[in-house]
From Swiss-Prot:
It comes from Geobacillus sp. (strain WCH70). This is Uncharacterized methyltransferase GWCH70_2477. InterPro entries: Methyltransf_25, rRNA_Ade_methylase_Trfase_N, SAM-dependent_MTases_sf, Uncharacterised_MeTfrase_YrrT. The lineage of its organism: Bacteria, Bacillati, Bacillota, Bacilli, Bacillales. It holds the Pfam family Methyltransf_25. Its EC number is 2.1.1.-. Could be a S-adenosyl-L-methionine-dependent methyltransferase.
Length: 213
């Protein structure tokens, strides 16, 4: 369910914001256009939002600035602490993950996440989308931004290019976690009653907007 990677992200809590700001050369392209990615997800969201993988609260902050109600889910206590330092008491952030989480206290119209859905296997992604379909009504949305690839060949090329550039942490990350392809995501959303569109934001990250039918 993604929690097998929790230790890595608890170690990353103190330096995550430096990484997204481009100070980590290996991940610079992964986080290229980061502000635009956050703004795009926030602007596509409705008024009452469930956010998975809050992290240090960067997307949450954008959502709040746009006047949205946000219920945050984050499995890492160090990350929750960082988010609370950034956001104060403006938002409720609770322990949970993509598959096991407390239900929000009021109906939601959008589920969002950035840079996190790849912690789930493709099978778990399908389970998660099925759960979310039960929480959403017709016209409601799932808006995720995450690393994904057009096809398996593009995925393999990305790993090979990272190795060639000496970006071994990035290459290991791409090989270790559960990054997927657009055709797999399209199938999973369609099977659970969504239409989905994809917009590429950098060499790695796509914004996926799935609308409940």
């Amino acid at each position: 369910m993604g929690r097998e990677f929790l230790g890595l992200f608890e170690e990353w809590a103190d330096s995550y914001d430096q990484s997204v700001e481009g100070y980590d050369e290996e991940y610079r392209e992964v986080f290229a256009n980061y502000e635009d990615i956050l703004n795009t997800v926030a602007s596509k969201a409705g008024s009452v939002v469930l956010e998975f993988g809050v992290g240090t609260g960067n997307l949450t902050k954008k959502l709040l600035e746009q006047g949205k109600t946000v219920y945050g889910i984050e499995p890492s206590e160090p990350m929750r602490k960082k988010a609370r330092e950034k956001l104060g008491d403006k938002v409720l952030i609770v322990d949970g993950d993509f598959l096991q989480f407390p239900l929000p206290p009021k109906p939601i119209d959008t589920i969002v996440s950035t840079y996190a859905f790849h912690h789930l296997t493709d099978e778990e992604k399908g389970e998660a989308i099925a759960k979310y379909s039960q929480l959403l009504k017709k016209g409601d949305k799932i808006v995720f931004a995450d690393t994904a690839f057009r096809d398996r060949q593009a995925f393999q090329r990305a790993i090979e290019e990272a190795r060639e550039r000496g970006f071994h942490h990035l290459a290991d990350d791409l090989g270790r976690e559960y990054y997927t392809t657009l055709d797999v995501l399209t199938k999973l959303f369609k099977e659970n009653g969504f239409t989905v569109t994809f917009t590429q934001k950098n060499a790695f990250v796509w914004v996926m907007e799935a609308v409940k039918q």
